[in-house]
Amino acid sequence: FDKLKTSPIRFMVPWTLQALWVFLTLNAVLVINTQSGEAPPLGVWDGIGLALWVVGFSVEVIADSQKTAFNAKPENAGKWIDEGLWSRSRHPNYLGEILLWTGIAIFGVACFDGLEMVAWISPIFVYLLLTKVSGVPILDRRALENWGEDPDYQRYRENTPVLFPRIGVQRQ
């Protein structure tokens, strides 16, 4: 990245991609916050969206905290985390992020009219980015490089869903 900074033309590509990422992710918030006139009264969809946002935010914060605490212990150096939320999902932090942005889009559903439905691009973009482009594919590839031959990791990978946990199902 530092090499890109020395050339304005080459630096423009990642900068533009980051700007696009921010715009697409914030799209639902922008549509909600730029409504003219009086805001519609809060309804069922607002409650569902807010609840989903709270769940997503909580999952992401808890997952990140658990991973930070795990990585802070010297005896865990070079190991993968498979405790807490990470015992139910291989990427609970990404699950939280996806739920959070989906909750925001649902919260604004009463505001969306016509072309404003483009706000749904936000959670769709976040999901596709994290599951198909950057997050999960890169981390899964790295995990396979590090622990792919380890039978315990193979068992963890086989028994732990990528994102959405199997509620009520015990791990093997």
Question: What name fits each language-model region?
Answer:
Residues 1-13, 79-86:
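Juxtamembrane helix-capping/reentrant segments at transmembrane boundaries
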